[in-house]
Structure formats: structure tokens, C-alpha cells
A protein has these predicted regions:
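S-adenosyl-L-methionine-dependent methyltransferase catalytic core, i.e., the SAM/SAH-binding region
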Residues: 1-303
Length: 303
């Protein structure tokens, strides 16, 4: 499959998310989800000669979209390691951080990666093809209870236990290594009127577990909170309730759990103030890019 920066991933809420950073021409910014480079290019277009942008992506395929600009540094790494990498580049404080947490269209459309149930493909689902266990490893090695927990916690599937049992029954006959074999094992449990949505939730749960997405998000947001200077902006786009809850909690309370701390006078103590109400794509953007429909943009400023 031939992929260009334009087809790799169409940037969602492009203007709104970059506007939210309130770009300072000489500032230092981080795009933690480089992908096709759409958001990064927009940030660079607003930076002056002394500004700099660090962009993260753990997928080797994203390197094909690297920008040729002295003000740009590409970091091939999971964004959870932002603190370590900023230390490596001797960056003490940043002026803003942007994250588009959606899975790139490239991943859904690549038949070899196993991110979509539209194709019969190996069950991989790793964002970084060099690291960690695959979705097939999880399906064939996790206990029935572990699988049920993954499907319930990360897919919010009400029949998680029945799905886990069906998978374990199937793997006693043969290993589950392809998307087609997974579909064959669980299709009888998918509600006909919601089959696509339930399958999407199942795939979401597996992808989150494979890539440790929730832990990585918590680590990244903690690092961002430490790195942002006073007045620095956090601009994050989420696509499902699990990641949105974490982002909302961090912006409101300063921690992923949403535990509100108060000062001596009973005032809520948080490192952020909300800059905007939640922003969603316009009807026009949703029509142009249907994958933007569930996107939510939240913007906060370090105080």
C-alpha cells in the first residue's frame, strides 16, 4: 500500500487545536503524535526562526513524513518518554504540547497491521513493530479472566466474559492468529444490530492492551505538566471516553484519577485553568473526514 503524508492521517480539528496552543514565534513546542505531520506542519508555519518543534511517533512508517526544517526534531519513541527525551535534548521547559490521540488512518487502512476487522490479516496491532506482544499473543496466552477484564475495562463490552469464554473455547481447537479467526470465534456473540460497533470496541480493547495506551497517556500527561512553563498550553484531541476521562481529570485536578486537592482556604488546587469549553468538529469537517466524528478537543493553560 502506497502511503503519502496526506493519506497517512487527515489532521483533525487542525486550526482549532493549533490555535489552542497560542503559538509564540520563538517558543518550544511538542507534537506527541506526529503521524502524517499535519499538525506539526501547521505549528511550524506559525513559528519564527528561533522557535523549535519536537515531534514524537513510535511507528517507523511515520518517518516517511518527516519535515525538512532546521526548527524540527523527530523523536522516534512512545510519547510516554517525553520527560526523558526532553532531558536528552536539554529542554527544561516547553511552551505548548499538542496530542491527537486517534489511531492514524494509515493503521486502519494497512491490511498487514491487523488494526481493522475489514481485512483478514495477522493480529498484530503494535504501533511500534519492534516492541512488545501482539494481539495474537494476548488472545492465545491470557487467561479467560484476564481477557474478560481487558474487554470490559478497555472496550466497555457488557458481555466481556462470554466473549472471553468463546475465545478460550476456540483456541483449544487452534491458535487465533488472524482477524478472520477472531471474527469466527466471537461473531455469534455480536448483537446483529450493533455488530460493527461491538467489533470496534473489541478491537479497541485489544489495541489499548497491546500498546499500553492508558499507562502511556498518564505518563505523557504527567511529563507534560512538569515540562510546561507558566502560561504554556496543553491541546489534546481524544476519541473515546477512557482517554477523554484521563485528559479531563488532568486538566481539572492535575492528576489522571481526578482526585481534587484543596489549599488551606479550601480552594481547588490544580496546575491548569481551562481555556475553552470542549470543542468538537464542525458538520463540514465530519462530512469531509468521517473519522473525526467522535473527536473532542480540550485545551488548558498551565498556571
Amino acid at each position: 500500500m502506497i502511503t503519502t503524508a496526506e493519506t497517512y492521517h487527515v489532521p483533525v480539528l487542525l486550526k482549532e487545536s493549533v490555535d489552542g496552543l497560542d503559538i509564540q514565534p520563538d517558543g518550544i513546542y511538542v507534537d506527541v503524535t506526529f503521524g502524517g505531520g499535519g499538525h506539526s506542519k501547521e505549528i511550524l508555519s506559525r513559528l519564527g526562526k528561533k522557535g523549535h518543534l519536537y515531534s514524537f511517533d513510535q511507528d517507523a512508517d511515520a518517518e516517511k513524513n518527516i519535515v525538512d526544517d532546521d526548527r524540527f526534531t523527530f523523536v522516534r519513541s512512545n510519547f510516554r518518554y517525553i520527560s526523558q527525551w526532553m532531558r536528552y535534548y536539554e529542554v527544561e521547559k516547553i511552551d505548548g504540547l499538542l496530542g491527537d490521540l486517534g489511531v492514524s488512518s494509515h493503521h486502519f487502512d494497512d491490511e498487514t497491521r491487523g488494526f481493522s476487522f475489514r481485512f483478514d490479516a495477522p493480529l498484530d496491532m503494535r504501533m511500534n513493530k519492534r516492541a512488545g506482544q501482539t494481539a495474537a499473543d494476548i488472545l492465545n496466552n491470557y487467561s479467560e479472566e484476564q481477557l474478560a477484564d481487558v474487554f470490559y475495562l478497555y472496550g466497555e463490552l457488557k458481555n466481556a466474559r462470554r466473549i472471553a469464554k468463546a475465545i478460550c473455547d476456540c483456541r483449544r481447537q487452534h491458535e487465533i492468529t488472524t482477524t478472520g479467526q477472531l471474527a469466527e470465534a466471537v461473531e455469534p456473540l455480536m448483537r446483529s444490530e450493533r455488530e460493527k460497533k461491538d467489533m470496534a470496541k473489541l478491537y479497541q480493547a485489544l489495541r489499548i492492551e497491546v500498546n499500553h495506551e492508558m499507562d502511556a497517556l498518564r505518563d505523557m500527561l504527567k511529563g507534560a505538566t512538569d515540562l510546561l512553563r507558566e502560561g504554556g498550553r496543553l491541546s489534546i484531541i481524544t476519541y473515546h471516553s477512557l482517554e477523554d476521562r484521563i485528559v479531563k481529570n488532568v486538566m481539572k485536578a492535575g492528576n489522571a484519577e481526578g482526585k481534587v486537592e484543596q489549599d488551606f482556604y479550601g480552594r481547588i488546587s490544580s496546575p491548569y485553568r481551562l481555556v475553552e469549553k470542549m470543542i468538537t468538529p464542525t458538520e463540514d469537517e465530519q462530512q469531509r473526514n468521517p473519522r473525526s466524528r467522535s473527536a473532542k478537543l480540550r485545551i488548558a493553560e498551565k498556571i
